[in-house]
């Protein structure tokens, strides 16, 4: 090894530098530059694209992992591989695998390379409790976890990173083999049996058989890994897997025509993948072949920068590895947490950017998905979010079957998604946003400063999700009759402020399409253009009901009643301006009663606080003896006899009316009723 050639006897001045250091000391101070530099050629690798270089490459990489060293491939070499190049790295080692300018060609269905970190510290069985403790020099105590290891633990100082795991299933698991496990940072070491951490993971696993270990301080760098294969039926092996490593770094990896996942991060902490590039990853789930370009599995805080991927199942995805409840394979425990994917591009994928149910806190920033399609077992979403507390920031989807899909159906607990600056554009048959929650859970989506444009009948579909939106612009260019900016399904809640709904083709459109009963809609300060293509503000069917409030500024009038359809329990308060005229069309009705029969009148779905009816009585005995139920307790109904009435108007006790006595109104007189939850009562005459 290079640096060993410069070892000097103690006290020797041979090879002493100007600053007094020996060459040996200079190498040591340079860290990784002072490790062994190994060449596959020195181990017998030909790199000629003909010979099988598996054995020499494997030995070269294993030596580097065992000793701590740097492997440098030959520029222009083509290494044929017929088996896995596997290495294990212990604590404190630095390993760099630099294959820049060379290429790997797999000839069998085997992983190309796997590097696994090996913890030299022992596994400790622990118990935990929530305490208040001072973890620094401040005067304020911190709520923390006191971790007690009766048999001793291996932590020595604040800031060390550990992993805890338990035989209980991880939160929001989607497989019965996904067991709990989360990393933590040591805040204080009190003794050889007690330490503290501010991580709250332990609250989830109290009372279980909890174990901890110190994560190995191994450094692994992989540079320029370039793998090219051919699609082969039955092949499914992964290409590169890094497991149980602290801050591994993968620099400019590249693949083409491979048969399974490319880069797998399994149980790593703070991994970085920089500028990965991939084309044509085969996706055949029936054969166990999954075209995952970057698979972030049970890792913590990964940074994936500059993905450029074409034709894969996922350009990025999370997953949880399979393990046994009582084994100590800590790197296979837990779910993916707090990873960030930045400046990514996925084109022609099945779902470009994806998270599975157990993931938490995954953030996509400035990522673009173009032309995602429905593939095998996938839904064609540019962004498919199935975890909790994920976020999309300044992301774009173009011509994807679904721009962004939030699916909480398989999540066992509550979940949230945050969307800011999202842009979508797609043709007919493609949906901008699909938000699907699970009945009985709280699933929330917060959207801000976003815009989508579609030729599809509906721009956004919501089911069992609470949506809060601000400054969202929905452009519906659909020529299909009765399209809508928002389609509200079962168990959905929509609250918007600001933004716009724009229509430019077709007819009979509406801002809201109510597709189920029980939904709640609160739309405020909405700009609406293309009102000439509209029929209603709210459209629904006669069997559906819900609570709806719409406040909008239209660029022109819409015909007739702003509510189309609706059951008797539908409650709608609509306020809008059109042509500089302010209107509350459901709050006022001009009616005529021209018969002496008992007349039951409907509120016309109005959910306004105050409703006014002006009734013209034209025959003797004209009367009202029934009114549909009020929308809420305290709702007020003013009934006036029009000055144009030629006869008295009689308000009788009857269906939902309990005034104590009938009220007779002369022309120009009125009565005020209020809803007490059971009947309309007289407030004044």
From Swiss-Prot:
Keywords: Degradation of host capsule during virus entry, Degradation of host cell envelope components during virus entry, Host-virus interaction, Viral attachment to host adhesion receptor, Viral attachment to host cell, Viral tail protein, Virion, Virus entry into host cell. GO terms for biological process: adhesion receptor-mediated virion attachment to host cell; symbiont entry into host cell via disruption of host cell envelope; symbiont entry into host cell via disruption of host cell glycocalyx. The keyword Membrane does not apply. The keyword Phosphoprotein does not apply. One of its GO terms (cellular component) is virus tail. InterPro entries: Pectin_lyas_fold (IPR012334). It is found in: Virion. In the N-terminal section; belongs to the Przondovirus depolymerase 2 family. Homotrimer. Interacts (via N-terminus) with depolymerase 1 (via N-terminus); this interaction probably gives rise to a branched tailspike. Functions as a receptor binding protein (RBP) and probably mediates the attachment to the host capsular exopolysaccharides. Displays a depolymerase activity that specifically degrades the K5-type polysaccharides of Klebsiella pneumoniae capsule, which allows the phage to reach the host cell membrane and bind the entry receptor. This is Depolymerase 2, capsule K5-specific.
């Amino acid at each position: 090894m290079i640096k060993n050639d410069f070892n000097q006897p103690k006290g020797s001045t041979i090879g002493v530098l100007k600053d007094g250091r020996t060459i040996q000391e200079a190498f040591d101070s340079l860290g990784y530059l002072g490790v062994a530099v190994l060449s596959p050629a020195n181990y017998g690798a030909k790199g000629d694209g003909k010979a099988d270089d598996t054995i020499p490459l494997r030995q070269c990489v294993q030596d580097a992992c065992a000793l701590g060293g740097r492997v440098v491939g030959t520029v222009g070499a083509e290494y044929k591989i017929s088996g896995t190049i596997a290495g294990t790295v212990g604590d404190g080692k630095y390993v760099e695998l630099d294959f820049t300018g060379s290429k790997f060609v797999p000839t069998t269905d085997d992983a190309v390379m796997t590097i696994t970190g090996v913890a030299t510290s022992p596994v400790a069985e622990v118990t935990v409790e929530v305490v208040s403790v001072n973890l620094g020099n401040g005067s304020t105590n911190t709520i923390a976890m006191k971790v007690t290891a009766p048999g001793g633990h291996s932590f020595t100082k604040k800031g060390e990173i550990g992993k805890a795991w338990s035989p209980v299933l991880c939160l929001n698991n989607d497989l019965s083999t996904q067991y709990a496990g989360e990393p933590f940072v040591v805040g204080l070491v009190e003794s050889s049996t007690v330490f503290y951490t501010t991580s709250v993971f332990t609250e989830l696993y109290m009372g279980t058989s909890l174990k901890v270990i110190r994560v190995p301080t191994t450094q692994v760098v992989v540079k320029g890994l370039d793998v090219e294969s051919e699609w082969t039926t039955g092949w499914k092996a992964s290409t590169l897997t890094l497991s149980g490593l602290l801050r591994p770094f993968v620099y400019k990896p590249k693949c083409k025509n491979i048969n399974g996942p490319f880069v797998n991060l399994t149980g790593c902490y703070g991994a970085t993948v920089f500028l990965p590039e991939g084309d044509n990853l085969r996706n055949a789930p029936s054969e166990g072949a999954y075209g995952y370009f970057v698979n972030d599995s049970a890792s913590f805080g990964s940074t994936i920068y500059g993905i450029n991927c074409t034709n894969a199942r996922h350009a990025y995805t999370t997953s949880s590895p399979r393990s046994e409840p009582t084994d100590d394979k800590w790197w296979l425990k837990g779910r993916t947490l707090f990873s960030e994917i930045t400046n990514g591009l996925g084109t022609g994928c099945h779902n470009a950017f994806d998270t599975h149910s157990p993931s938490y806190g995954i953030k996509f920033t400035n990522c673009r998905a173009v032309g995602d399609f429905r593939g095998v077992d996938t839904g064609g979403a540019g962004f498919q979010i199935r975890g909790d507390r994920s976020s999309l920031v300044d992301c774009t989807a173009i011509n994807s079957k679904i721009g962004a899909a939030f699916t909480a159906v398989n999540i066992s607990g509550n979940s949230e998604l945050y969307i800011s600056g999202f842009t979508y554009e797609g043709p007919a048959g493609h949906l901008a946003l699909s938000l699907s929650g699970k009945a009985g859970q709280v699933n929330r989506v917060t959207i801000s400063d976003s815009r989508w444009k579609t030729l599809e009948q509906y721009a956004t579909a919501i089911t069992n999700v609470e949506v809060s939106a601000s400054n969202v612009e929905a452009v519906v260019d659909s020529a299909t009759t009765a399209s809508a900016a928002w389609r509200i399904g079962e168990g959905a809640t929509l609250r918007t402020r600001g933004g716009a709904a724009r229509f430019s083709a077709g007819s009979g459109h509406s801002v809201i399409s109510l597709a189920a009963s029980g939904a709640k809609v609160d739309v405020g300060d909405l700009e609406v253009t293309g009102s000439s293509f509209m029929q209603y503000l709210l459209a629904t069917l006669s069997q559906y009901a819900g609570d709806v409030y719409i406040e909008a500024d239209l660029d022109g009038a819409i015909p007739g009643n702003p509510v189309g359809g609706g059951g008797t329990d539908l409650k709608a308060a609509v306020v809008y301006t059109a042509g500089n005229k302010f209107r509350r069309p459901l709050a006022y009705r001009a009616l005529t009663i021209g018969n002496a029969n008992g007349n039951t009148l409907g509120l016309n779905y109005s959910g306004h606080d105050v409703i006014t009816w002006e009734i013209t009585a034209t025959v003797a005995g004209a009367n009202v003896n029934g009114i549909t139920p009020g929308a809420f307790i305290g709702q007020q109904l003013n009934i006036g006899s029009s000055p144009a009435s030629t006869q008295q108007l009689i308000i009788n006790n009857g269906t939902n009316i309990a005034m104590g006595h009938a009220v007779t109104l002369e022309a120009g007189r009125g009565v005020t009723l209020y809803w007490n939850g059971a009947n309309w009562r007289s407030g004044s005459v």
